[in-house]
Amino acid sequence: MEDKESIAQAADILRRGGLLAIPTETVYGLGADGLDETAVLHIFEAKGRPQDNPLILHIPDASWLTRYCEDVPDAAYKLAERFWPGPLTMILKKKPCVPLRTTGGLETVGMRCPDHAVTRAIIEASGVPVAAPSANTSGRPSCTTAEHVREDMWGKIDGIVDGGPCQVGVESTIIDLTVTPPQLLRPGGLPLESLRDALGEVTVDKAVTQKMNDGEKPRAPGMKYRHYAPKAPVTVVTGGAKASARYLLTHAGEKSGIICFDEFAQLFDGHIVHPLGASDDKRAQAQHVFDALRTFDETSVGEIWAQCPDSKGLGLAIGNRLKKAAGFHVEDADDGKIVIGITGGTGAGKTSLLRALERKGACVLDCDAVYHEMLKDDELLLRALREAFGDVIFRQDGSVDVHAIGLIVFKDRKKLAELDAIVHERIPRALAQKMAATNAEIIGLDAIKLIESGLGAICDATVAVTAPEEVRVKRIMARDSITEEYARSRIAAQKDADYFRAQCDYEFVNDLPTAEKAEHAAEVYINTIINNLKEETER
């Protein structure tokens, strides 16, 4: 919609007192003439928005500030020069021409210049400041696409300008410049660090991290009321990414919806999952957070569990939106535990590292042993195995015949892949529950398929144990009393050392001639890893 005629038509809707959904870089806004009290009232009615929740005025550039604001401080122009157009709203003293209905009864007004050329052109053509809260039903997740706007506003407004998906994905940052020092009222698309870099001291209002008290008057949008909420209740889990993923595995129910970082999505097979973005990609998380919350309204999930990024950069805004969606129902996953995953092919010598962990007081979990334990009474696992392989894998007493499963899967790669998928869906939760139950500060995971199962993602460190093939052959022959030919065939059937080396954080080459030397080297190696992890945590 970049042609002059379309822009003129959109501007005319605003001048006539109509409601127009407009795109910005943050979220879609529900726009109206901010000086027209009747038009502003229609915004509140269309959204079902509380009357004391102030609106933001959108302008095409900083030269419009003095039209609507008194005593504009130098800091406002400094911020405008540096960050406008962009995701920043400044709270300033309003002039009498700005209705109290627009400001929620306040003598201040939020001013913003959006970073969307079409929307700025529409505002310029209309000749009026455009009051534009997010174009969603009040309380629901904000709209980041025109389709989201249609879902909430169809039949209630006069038009939608489709500008494609929003590039930032969370609303603007709001800073109050009427107080000294300036105060952050709402985190958003411009990080707090950027404001402090420009102005020096900037304080943070308590409403950013906790619920406002009843009776308190909000000084800016997004401060007081439950916002961004899907229909199902939300629980937000804070803490390190790996720790919070383990927490979700332990606590989320079988039918819970999951919002998680990309690298953990595989662990929640069987759930309805909406990946938020990689744990280190907050720009992607900001773009996806509202879409993630909205997605679950199309499902039957009874609850939603969400991982939360740290508060650095855009993380403060993303976490704020998630916590408000949850009504500040937040649980902290950081338990101080260190999880080290040990993997490698048969005969590589994993036992040396596992024993070193045990000597450090670690709880060592053998994934294969946990799987066999689950075969006794995990009803969902047993049902899935019966559906996949039939009654032939069950003995007369109802127990699982592991040998019978082996006869099927080792002759048929598709069946082996099917078995892996079933086990990998069930075992992460069982292991996470055992991790949560132990009092040990260090946990070791022993798993040949640590990477393929997704379990490596929840380990604070992963170690590939490797050894030359000739060494492995001799170890397997001695350990299992098998022929050289059979030992080599077993090695050939597994991933090679290059695979494990590429997938893990560390490599321990266990080619030492005696068990005593191997265990001494392993102990030194484990101590190094643990010290490295503790130093990373302290940083």
Model-derived segments and their meaning:
Residues 348:
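ATP-binding Walker
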Residues 345:
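P-loop (Walker A) phosphate-binding loop of NTP-binding proteins
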Residues 3, 8, 433-442, 456-465, ...:
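NTP-dependent small-molecule kinase module
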Residues 358-367, 380:
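Post-Walker A helix-loop "phosphate-sensing" segment adjacent to the P-loop in P-loop NTPases
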Residues 1-334:
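Active-site-adjacent structural elements in enzyme catalytic cores
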Residues 340-342:
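Hydrophobic anchor at the beta1->P-loop junction of P-loop NTPases
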Residues 372-439:
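ATP-dependent small-molecule kinase phosphotransfer cores
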Residues 351:
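Walker A/P-loop
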